[in-house]
């Protein structure tokens, strides 16, 4: 018999035929990826039939969408499946104990639905801060010696759009990824013998035609020095019915049809940000992937308002691992225009990582890193338990500055690197009021921004009056561990010897 705890590791979706928009939809239609794409939520009118929105909330979302569209951005697309992960009232979510639900909105809502927050603080992040163009040849983009990204799909190809995406969803034709660009990228990968790993990405690598996917994988398979093919996709998370045996068979066959010797190692990289996304449907999709011999790794983005919480991160990492997804990276949110309200101070991320170490299985604790603008690549932000330089200075005891010196993988030193966005006090206070009015209460919109004066000089960082308090008892409670002596989980059987002996003698294992 499955225990109650095991039954509860997967989040439940809402029943689609109990939602106004899909009352007459059949199971067959619902489980068809083509139907999901055709019926994606693209308007506020559709959204109102799925979640509760006040007239003001609906109006403000509509205003946001129109403004973004006028800037050339296609901002709203949610698959029906992913929409069922949103609670009916996203402004008053039910959450786990310790997650401070009164200060939160539904995490899938935050990730999927543009709000007035996306129009605030326009001068705090650059448009296209993570642009690939300056380091590209055709569809290939490189910033490391041995690996490369091959962009095979437009930004607008994704099944569902992520509000926090580092790449703006453009409506103009300049984002087209045509066959010539792909061929130029394939040529470069074959030309540069240092490259042994390629990231096939987009947009979403699994949202292109089967014909194009087969062609790309077969051509990559012909390159002798290429050893690893990584496929970047969020389809398992936002549209798991799109992960079919037919698709997986095509990937396995195509990647090695023309390879010689040892087969190319193919694996998937996906994007889970919250345990609410770890559902039975996702678990089934991951099992199909693993049954075809592929592994799945994950990159989570640390997002203020979504998963900026010790309990939330712990549940997200361990639940995804329990269904077969390896938590690979926890990434700092990019300082991109329109999404700076999602940024969490790096110090907070380091504190979470410090206190996850040892309390979760090592393989479930990802590497914390920031992707540096301008082709700097990833810089690790992991805290260390080995202190030789900062004697008696602990990361979780004093609020640090909001900037630091970072050193990239190739030895470049960036002085005063800032992870947070900037704002004047007037702009910040006006923005908070707009969002308080939109949400309907205070305290749920807490952007972390650097407040500057008229000369750009740092005054303070907002919403940083305290650091997470994570003593052992608190961590034990948040992680749901049974407590023994000293308010700690049992880590030595000898500490509970009498209880164990008594229980063993009553168990089926006792032979007398």
Residue spans for each PLM region:
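Conserved AdoMet/S-adenosylmethionine-binding subsite of the radical SAM
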Residues: 183, 188, 206-360
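Cysteine-centered iron-sulfur cluster-binding motifs in ferredoxin-type domains/subunits
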Residues: 153-161
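Conserved Radical SAM active-site core
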Residues: 113, 121-151, 163-263
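C-terminal accessory regions of radical SAM enzymes
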Residues: 353-499, 504-505, 509-511
């Amino acid at each position: 018999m499955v225990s109650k705890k095991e039954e509860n590791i997967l989040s439940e979706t809402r029943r689609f035929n109990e939602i106004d928009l899909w009352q007459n939809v059949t199971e067959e239609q619902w489980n068809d990826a083509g139907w999901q794409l055709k019926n994606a939520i693209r308007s506020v009118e559709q959204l109102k039939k799925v979640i509760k929105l006040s007239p003001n909330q609906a109006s403000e979302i509509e205003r946001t969408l129109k403004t973004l569209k006028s800037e050339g951005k296609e901002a709203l697309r949610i698959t029906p499946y992913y929409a069922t992960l949103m609670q009916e009232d996203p402004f008053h979510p039910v959450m786990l104990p310790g997650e401070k639900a009164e200060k939160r909105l539904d995490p899938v809502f935050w990730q999927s639905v543009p709000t007035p927050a996306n129009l605030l603080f326009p001068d705090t992040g650059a448009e296209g801060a993570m642009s690939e163009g300056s380091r590209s040849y055709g569809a290939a983009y490189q910033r490391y010696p041995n690996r490369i990204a091959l962009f095979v799909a437009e930004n607008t190809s994704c099944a569902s759009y992520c509000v926090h995406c580092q790449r703006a969803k453009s409506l103009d034709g300049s984002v087209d990824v045509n066959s010539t660009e792909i061929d130029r990228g394939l040529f470069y990968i074959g030309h540069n013998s240092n490259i042994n790993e390629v990231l096939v990405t987009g947009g979403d690598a699994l949202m292109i035609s089967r014909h194009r996917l087969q062609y790309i994988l077969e051509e990559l398979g012909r390159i002798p020095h290429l050893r690893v093919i990584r496929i970047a996709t969020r389809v398992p998370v936002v549209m798991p019915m799109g992960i079919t045996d037919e698709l997986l068979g095509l990937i396995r066959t195509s990647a090695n049809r023309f390879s010689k010797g040892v087969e190319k190692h193919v694996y998937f990289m996906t994007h889970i940000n919250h345990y609410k996304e770890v559902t039975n449907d996702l678990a089934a999709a991951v099992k199909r992937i693993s049954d075809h011999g592929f592994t799945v790794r994950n990159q989570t983005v640390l997002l203020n308002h979504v998963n900026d919480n010790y309990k939330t991160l712990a549940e997200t990492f361990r639940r995804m691992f329990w269904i077969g997804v390896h938590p690979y990276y926890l990434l700092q949110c990019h300082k991109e225009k329109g999404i700076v309200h999602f940024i969490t101070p790096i110090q907070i991320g380091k504190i979470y990582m410090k206190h996850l170490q040892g309390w979760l299985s090592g393989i479930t604790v990802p590497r914390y890193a920031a992707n540096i603008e301008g082709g700097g690549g990833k810089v690790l932000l992991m805290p260390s338990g080995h202190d030789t330089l900062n004697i008696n200075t602990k990361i979780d005891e004093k609020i640090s500055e909001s900037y630091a010196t970072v050193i990239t993988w190739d030895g470049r030193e960036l002085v005063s690197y800032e992870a947070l966005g900037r704002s004047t006090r007037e702009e910040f206070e006006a923005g908070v009021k707009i969002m308080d009015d939109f949400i309907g209460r205070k305290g749920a919109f807490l952007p972390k921004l650097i407040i500057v004066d008229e000369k750009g000089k740092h005054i303070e960082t907002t919403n940083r009056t305290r650091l997470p308090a994570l003593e052992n008892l608190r961590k034990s409670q948040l992680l749901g561990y049974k407590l023994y002596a000293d308010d700690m989980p049992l880590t030595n059987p000898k500490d509970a010897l009498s209880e164990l002996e008594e229980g063993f003698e009553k168990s089926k294992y006792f032979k007398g």
